[in-house]
């Protein structure tokens, strides 16, 4: 019906705005790609700070622990992975270009997967509740075990995710093939400022436009 078309059109527009905002993580990753941060002594200082942060998140009582759920584990895994990858890039300069290429490919794959997964989730969420994402979807992060159990029982998870990963891999291959020059010839500081200006403008407009 016309109402359904309007709802999904509005939903797609809303998703585009949200993804523009969430692309901030991708933007941060891309603008911080450089070789200068691995020079002495900067590289060792940064690595030491990352190790300290990882130990604090792992053994300390952080704000993530107050929220509970899967957030502490997610934070620990993210910082631990960041520390490991920075260490590899720092201590293995001969393999830095190769590691950076595969890391870039993985980040693009992860981003594409999240976008596609969100589309699939919205489809099933609509069929289940008759509405778009709301606070119930946010609660999924807190009640992870219960939600995962319900999903595994209710939907053909393995075929869905198999197809999702195949499509995401194909899209990632196309994107990386067209954009790998970004990591082969790292943009200058001035170029990064220009790119950042454009993104921050889109970020601000999207943030103000999100319903």
Regions found by a protein language model. Give the residues of each.
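Transmembrane and membrane-interface helices of multi-pass
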Residues: 1-211
């Amino acid at each position: 019906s016309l109402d359904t078309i309007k709802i999904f059109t509005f939903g797609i527009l809303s998703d585009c705005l949200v993804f523009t905002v969430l692309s901030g993580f991708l933007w941060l990753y891309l603008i911080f790609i450089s070789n200068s941060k691995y020079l002495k002594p900067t590289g060792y200082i940064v690595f030491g700070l990352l190790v300290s942060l990882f130990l604090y998140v792992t053994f300390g009582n952080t704000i993530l622990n107050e929220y509970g759920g899967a957030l502490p584990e997610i934070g620990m895994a993210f910082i631990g992975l960041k520390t490991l990858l920075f260490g590899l890039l720092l201590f293995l300069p001969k393999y830095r270009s190769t590691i950076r290429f595969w890391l870039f490919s993985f980040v693009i794959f992860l981003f594409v997967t999240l976008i596609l997964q969100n589309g699939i989730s919205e489809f099933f969420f609509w069929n289940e509740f008759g509405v778009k994402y709301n606070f119930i979807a946010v609660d999924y992060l807190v009640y992870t075990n219960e939600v995962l159990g319900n999903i595994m029982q209710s939907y053909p998870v393995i075929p869905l995710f198999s197809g999702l990963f195949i499509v995401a891999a194909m899209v990632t291959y196309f994107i990386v093939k067209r954009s790998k020059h970004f990591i082969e010839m790292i943009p200058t500081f001035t170029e990064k400022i220009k790119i950042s200006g454009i993104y921050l403008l889109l970020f601000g407009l999207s943030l103000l436009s999100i319903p």
